[in-house]
């Protein structure tokens, strides 16, 4: 049994190796897990190594190899042709959104997050709205920091396993690594896309061949958070 942080680090290393062929640096791992120092990463890596999930490769820099993944690991469907970080997914009926005005912890170890409106997975729509209701989200899907929920509208991210009507869990922030799926504000419009840093430009990539990649200057794109999880509810 892995702790939440051990699981998060293992999946981050696994996805980064799939994306680039190289394990992430200690600085990247520290930032991804919101840890204050690299010593915490060293402890997590040692624990994963002792449990047989990863191993260090001798005589190579940044040399970590994922040996196995926990059986309960669940990720969204991979983007075809583009290995990348994929969020945790909770599928099922779920709990209905509530209209509670204040954040609170539910009895089943979940946190009620604000649903701030709809986000376009397609052509950008108007910028994020004000809170309309709240959705219980399991604590296991969340780390440190402030989070919010958006309802997906459109089909441009279907090859990343993100479907029309899904609820995406967003960690609030104004920075993201290349390859991460983000909420991007372009002018007065918000969209959910994979961010790529290409020299001095920012590319917003869809995960659907019907949609073109859009290129912007760095001052034209405002990151408002990055995707960390997804809830799919069946009615």
Curated annotation (Swiss-Prot):
Superkingdom per UniProt: Bacteria
UniProt-annotated stretches for the region Disordered: 72-104
Keyword DNA-binding: yes
Single annotated GO MF: serine-type endopeptidase activity
EC number(s) stated in the UniProt entry for this protein: 3.4.21.88
Pfam family of the protein (one): LexA_DNA_bind
Active-site residues, record numbering mapped to chain: 156 (for autocatalytic cleavage activity), 193 (for autocatalytic cleavage activity)
Site residues (Cleavage), renumbered to this chain: 121-122
InterPro entries: LexA, LexA-like, LexA/Signal_pep-like_sf, LexA_DNA-bd_dom, LexA_repressor, Peptidase_S24_LexA, Peptidase_S24_S26A/B/C, WH-like_DNA-bd_sf
Keywords tagged on the record: Autocatalytic cleavage, DNA damage, DNA repair, DNA replication, DNA-binding, Hydrolase, Repressor, SOS response, Transcription, Transcription regulation
Catalyses which reaction(s): Hydrolysis of Ala-|-Gly bond in repressor LexA
Residue range(s) of DNA binding per entry: 26-46
Subunit structure, as described in the record: Homodimer.
Membership in a protein family: Belongs to the peptidase S24 family.
Its job: Represses a number of genes involved in the response to DNA damage (SOS response), including recA and lexA. In the presence of single-stranded DNA, RecA interacts with LexA causing an autocatalytic cleavage which disrupts the DNA-binding part of LexA, leading to derepression of the SOS regulon and eventually DNA repair.
Annotated NCBIfam families: lexA
Protein name listed in UniProt: LexA repressor
Gene this protein is translated from: lexA
């Amino acid at each position: 049994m892995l702790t939440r942080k051990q699981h998060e680090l293992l999946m981050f290393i696994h996805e980064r190796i799939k994306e680039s062929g190289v394990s992430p640096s200690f600085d990247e791992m520290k930032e991804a897990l919101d840890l204050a120092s690299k010593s915490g990463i060293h402890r997590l890596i040692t624990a994963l190594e002792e449990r047989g999930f990863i191993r260090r490769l001798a005589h190579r820099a940044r040399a970590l190899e994922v040996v196995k993944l926990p059986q309960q690991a669940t990720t969204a469907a991979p983007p075809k042709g583009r290995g990348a970080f994929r969020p945790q997914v909770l599928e099922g009926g779920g709990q209905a959104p509530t209209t509670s005005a204040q954040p609170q912890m539910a009895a089943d170890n979940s946190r009620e997050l604000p649903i701030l409106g709809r986000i376009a997975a397609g052509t950008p729509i108007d910028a994020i709205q004000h809170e309309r209701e709240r959705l219980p989200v399991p604590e296991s899907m969340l780390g440190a920091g402030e989070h919010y929920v958006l309802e997906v509208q459109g089909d441009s991210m279907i090859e990343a396993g993100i479907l029309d009507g899904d609820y995406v869990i967003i960690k609030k922030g104004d920075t993201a690594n290349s390859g991460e799926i983000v909420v991007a504000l372009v002018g007065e419009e918000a969209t959910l896309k994979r961010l790529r840093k290409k020299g001095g430009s920012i590319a917003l990539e869809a995960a659907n061949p019907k949609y073109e990649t859009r290129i912007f200057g760095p001052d034209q794109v405002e990151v408002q958070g990055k995707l960390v999880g997804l809830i799919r509810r069946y009615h």
